[in-house]
Amino acid sequence: MTAHEVNFDGLVGLTHHYAGLSFGNEASTRHRFQVSNPRLAVKQGLLKMKALADAGFPQAVIPPHERPFIPALRQLGFTGSDEQILDKVARQAPRWLSSVSSASPMWVANAATVCPSADALDGKVHLTVANLNNKFHRALEAPVTEALLRAIFRDESQFSVHSALPQVALLGDEGAANHNRLGGEYGSAGVQLFVYGREEENEIRPARYPARQSREASEAVARLNQVNPQQVIFAQQNPEVIDQGVFHNDVIAVSNRQVLFCHEAAFARQKVLINQLRTRVDGFMAIEVPAGEVSVSDAVATYLFNSQLLSRNDGLMLLVLPRECQDHVGVWRYLNKLVAEDNPISAMQVFDLRESMANGGGPACLRLRVVLTEEERRAVNPAVMMNDALFTALNAWADRYYRDRLTAADLADPLLLREGREALDVLTRLLDLGSVYPFQQTGAADG
């Protein structure tokens, strides 16, 4: 059956700021307390979406979350009206305010893990929401992510959206950022590669930075998504690269159809994995980048592998890269050599995503890949599909509501909270989502 990959990109939220919340993500730590530009950030993402849609790659959007997220502060014991809570937290515990204001839901590669219908035992598209257990600011995301995905993939005859795994470290799940699918045509059965950083009773794990994904979580997600057990491989990421800042597998590897593009040090027991894939994926090709050409540290600094690898209609592939790759002499030299060689990657497209990149999120972080047949695509909420009208509407919406300068101190401004809620109210109508946010369901601005 004919199917296409649709990229669902996250819209950057109104409270996009640099707080250094993500230990193990070196860009996040390095840019802590810098001044952000939320309006520029959302527009950089929109430009990427529109350019790819115009080039013929199906593209859709996933909205941001409600931030600052007052219900989480109430859970932490802060009381009073929403405005009083903001004031108390800003004075007493500003780090909590930064955490509940994080715009991290924009990195929708962590929203869920997707199983196309061709791989599922019941023939439906499955999406299991990630619990993002390793970081408090990200663990807040799962309930609203689930509501958003149900509002987008609302036809239960075609789609199954599963709640996140229990919020315990044993089942830490980071979603599609630790998942690749390899195979031939998108509509044919593929091989799903789940990548984990740790498992119980396995002493091979990083020493400096946390391994966020457990094998136990990956196995549970594969079961929930009804992936045919004959089509699954579980592989461990190299703990040494996690300790160098590779906090998700999509910082060191990316796949598309029969191609796996990765660093030579990406996986533990990499030769064994490559041989497995060669046996199970027809026409499999591994493009392993030697450390002598691109070091792991340069790969992390430029997000070379946090790129999108997209299939063009002529059968060749386009590599979508952040501008940091072009700015790095060694990485850019390697890439130009790569596209000149005999392999499916024949072209590159560079985007300026510096607002997201400074928080540790490149092109691949910003998108969730969903393979859909034509019938399934028609069943997706049509209001989220990128086109000229939606691009124009979202830019006007961003101009109206987004600030062009934001610091951690600004998060306590009650006006920012009101601006955000008004913006999301408008957005849910624009995207035909219904009342997906807690503030819409309570019907009150103050608690």
UniProtKB/Swiss-Prot annotation:
EC numbers = 3.5.3.23
- Pathway membership of this protein? Amino-acid degradation; L-arginine degradation via AST pathway; L-glutamate and succinate from L-arginine: step 2/5
Residues the entry annotates as binding substrate: 19-28, 110, 137-138, 212, 250, 359
Keywords assigned: Arginine metabolism, Hydrolase
User: Briefly, what is this protein's role?
Assistant: Catalyzes the hydrolysis of N(2)-succinylarginine into N(2)-succinylornithine, ammonia and CO(2).
Q: Which family does it belong to?
A: Belongs to the succinylarginine dihydrolase family.
The protein's name in its UniProt record: N-succinylarginine dihydrolase
Source lineage:
Bacteria, Pseudomonadati, Pseudomonadota, Gammaproteobacteria, Enterobacterales
